[in-house]
């Protein structure tokens, strides 16, 4: 029996080696694709191509008796690696005549990411940090674009301190709140103004499939090329007004981050044994705990800035607190029917999204379980 099992395992090892060789060949082809895309200014991520390819592979897998979900899982992981490696080939310069780009706060993580992407795209990039401020006027004197990438709590102050910029210079900010910084830029500069909010962390590795929100400030025709450049990097653009942006971010960022903070604080105050929680946890709780722990591995100043960026955020969090209390009252009253009625009400509000999110989360939970040791 042992000899038979060993022989089968040896065959599996040989198949795995063949898979490795095929993956290496695929990455070589991806590198060639990256060179072609760079030369012609084509975006890294093309949704239609990816969807078509996955649909074809799923059908072919089913015909071979291979679970379609398996090949999709494998290919999605391979494609993520492919998108990352395509970065190394650089990108076409969509605005060759652009004068130097100055990134204010370019030493920070997001600033460094934009410096990398702009440099890979053939633009000259300068960094303006706090210790360079006495030379700021010289550094921005011939700038074609100035990107402000500083902590939220000093963004408007830094914008207000900028020396006069060339009239055709594009002024951009990357803050997580948009209305205040956008208004500050419109006051500080008479030329083109653009508000950006990258909806991802600087450790993403690739901009493929990442969302970049943009808010028009002034003269969109002057910065249209930059939006197209960001699309070439693989990102998806979403336009919204600065006011609507901040209203949505109250839910997406402020409330979510605060709830995560409060849960982490509760765990710490209860002094639970994390090792035991992890050993006993289901995949969904492990994933939730990972998201909580991830928050506390990052800069507390950033999250304080996001959560406390407006009175609107505080009002929303207070409403959440009130509803939390109302839900606790159901428990205190032991009113299961009222709980079920509330549950059904929310279920109805989610509509088809409930089933969609269940399917999406099922994939995430399988991946989380795969990573368990």
Map each language-model feature to its residues.
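Extended, charge-rich alpha-helical interface modules
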Residues: 1-102, 116
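Hydrophobic Val/Ile/Leu positions in short beta-strands of Rossmann-like dinucleotide-binding domains
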Residues: 103-104, 148, 214
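Hydrophobic/small residue at the entry helix of a nucleotide-binding pocket
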Residues: 109-110
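Active-site-proximal catalytic alpha-helix in oxidoreductases
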Residues: 210, 224, 245-271, 278-297
